[in-house]
């Protein structure tokens, strides 16, 4: 009897135990597995997102660092360019200043040299003019002597005819209102005209002036009264100096390459001036 009770009790306990333990359900197991898989996928997805966020953050930081480096490099390059440009400008300014000083000093030295050369040329010109004056005076003396001899002969010839030559000879010996006096006065005026120029232009201008002198002397050789033609030479020297100064300026401008043209034009101006003198000189015969 006790055995049956124990067996029954064991059976009851077994039944209770079986009843209290959950019966495994396949659907619940599948649900749990799916939930676990979803949780694992969510965790993986979260890890991937976190990793992507980290990569993006790292890329952003890298780009920011690169931008800062580029900005710094550009700033340094600009600073170097500015420094270089300032240095170049300063160097150019210094070089320009030195060149300006050199040019100014060279111009001063050149001006000093030209002044010294002009003084020397002036001394040489003065000597040459003195020589030319001596030669012209000697020529003038010879011509005066020849004119006086011719006047004496004419006076003798005319004195034999009617005594007219004696009056002319007397006026010639007196040196006033005579052809000889007119000649001397005109020569004095013409010889007083000077050409201020440097060689080789000066000699060419003097040759052109010589045409004016010779032609003028030939036109007044028979004029008895110088007082009638004296006004014709009032501004002659001034006009010649204007023409000569213009010739010097033009020759200096072309640096001597146009000296032939300048000399020929000056001679033409002297010929024109002679033709302008002719009507005035004709008044001495009346």
Curated annotation (Swiss-Prot):
Entry comment on modification after translation: Not glycosylated.
Subunit structure: Monomeric in solution; likely has an elongated non-globular form. Interacts with human and rat collagens (via a RGQOGVMGF peptide, where O is hydroxyproline).
Keyword hit for Acyltransferase: no
Location (main, coarse): secreted
Family of the protein in this entry: Belongs to the aegyptin family.
Signal sequence segment: 1-20
Protein name: Simplagrin
Note: Does not interact with host vitronectin (VTN), fibronectin (FN1), fibrinogen, VWF, recombinant platelet receptors GPVI (GP6) and integrin alpha-2/beta-1 (ITGA2/ITGB1), thrombin (F2), and coagulation factors Va (F5) and Xa (F10). Has no effect on host blood clotting, vasodilation, inflammation and murine splenocyte proliferation. Reduces occlusive thrombus formation time in photochemically induced thrombosis model in mice without compromising hemostasis.
Function, as annotated: Inhibits host platelet aggregation induced by low concentrations of collagen via blocking the von Willebrand Factor (VWF) interaction with collagen.
UniProt-annotated stretches for the region Disordered: 17-179
GO BP: any one term: suppression of platelet aggregation in another organism
Acidic residues bias: start-end ranges: 24-69, 103-129
UniProtKB keywords: Glycoprotein, Hemostasis impairing toxin, Platelet aggregation inhibiting toxin, Secreted, Signal, Toxin
A GO term from the CC aspect: extracellular region
Keyword Cytoplasm included in the entry's annotation: no
Compositionally biased spans, kind Low complexity: 166-177
Entry-listed glycosylation sites: 116
A GO MF term: collagen binding
Tissue: Salivary gland.
Subcellular location: Secreted
